[in-house]
Amino acid sequence: MEGLREARFPFSKLDENLICPIKTFAPEVREGSTVPTPVLFLQANFIRGGLLLTINAVHRTMDITGQVHMLSLLSKACRNVPFTDEEVTNGNLDRRNIIPLLDENWEADAQPPVIPKTTSTDTPSKQSAPPPQIGYAWAYFSFTSTSVAQLKAHATSSVTSPSAFVSSDDSLCALIWQSIARARLARLDPATASIFTRIVEIRQLFDIPKEFPGNIVTQTLNNSTLQDVTSQTIGDLASQLRSKLDPESLKHTFQANATRQARTKNKIIKPAAVDHSNFVMMSSWMKADCYDFDFNLGLGKPEAVRRPKFTPFPGAVFLSPRALDGEVVAGMCLREDEMEILKADEELLKYGQYIG
């Protein structure tokens, strides 16, 4: 535990193959299977001087909000604290009717938004060289509460539209997207598309109680070029991300997708083909309150909440739950050459510190 603490709990020391009860990309459950399938796994890893408690949830059954609420219930149960009537009722709502579908007059003429398939272009100087063996790296970057506040202030002051609001989450997402885009400019043409998707939790848009554990998220799609992403101010890029969070648009798109799926006989959704060389998928857990759970173990509150390293997923970025002192840790998976550039990115290092 002391070694982990001194290293600040990096990806390199937190491998899911060693500390998790199931892998992130576990085999799919076969359609029509009648065998009950667990949806929440826990594993206690006893190490010298401490404990690593890992919790895996099946994403089809719950999002991060649902998973955190399930953990809050587990922590209450461990302390023999009874659940409230509201927790029991809202936790058992009928998922089949939780999202109101659009009426029969709605025409499914528009296709659901998809991540565009793009082809990246290496710079001419790199085209003649044989393609190197690509390696991928997971790494964490730490942002203190002070640096996050400074970043938000900088973003707010650099928005060209005077009435635009940007949050800390918007600002941090913009900084990370722009930093990754700069790293990719070392090998890609500036006109190459840069795709940024952002997972958004939308319970409040449908008056769904926060105690409902189901998967109620959608994603926004931002499509620019590397040149555009790197040339904008942090404030304008954050404002661009914020503009995709229009409540009515998010609500209608989600209902349209749900209605389209309800009218489709084949319910299996195949994942879209993605060019990971210019793709960033952001999932923010900053608001997930994970640092108050003690599970009555007598060990106090957790020192760190992290996402263990798993199979490389280039372009994936996770903002970990905000710590008690306000620290936010961003975990990301990139090509090794991109990560080396990112580790020396002066703009990123104004606010963040590399952990690994």
Q: What role is predicted for each listed range?
A:
Residues 1, 87-156, 185, 194-206:
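Short amphipathic alpha-helices and their capping loops
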Residues 1-111, 153, 168-188, 281-356:
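Non-catalytic N-terminal regions of enzymes
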Residues 25, 57, 126, 130-134, ...:
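A near-ubiquitous, low-amplitude feature marking generic local secondary-structure context
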Residues 26, 57, 103, 125, ...:
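Intrinsically disordered, low-complexity regions enriched for glutamine and histidine
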Residues 36-38, 135, 276:
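Residues that act as N-cap/strand-start positions at coil-to-secondary-structure junctions
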Residues 54, 102, 115-118, 124-128, ...:
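Generic hydrophobic, helix-prone segments enriched in Leu/Val/Ile
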Residues 138-140, 144-356:
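Acyl-CoA-dependent O-acyltransferases
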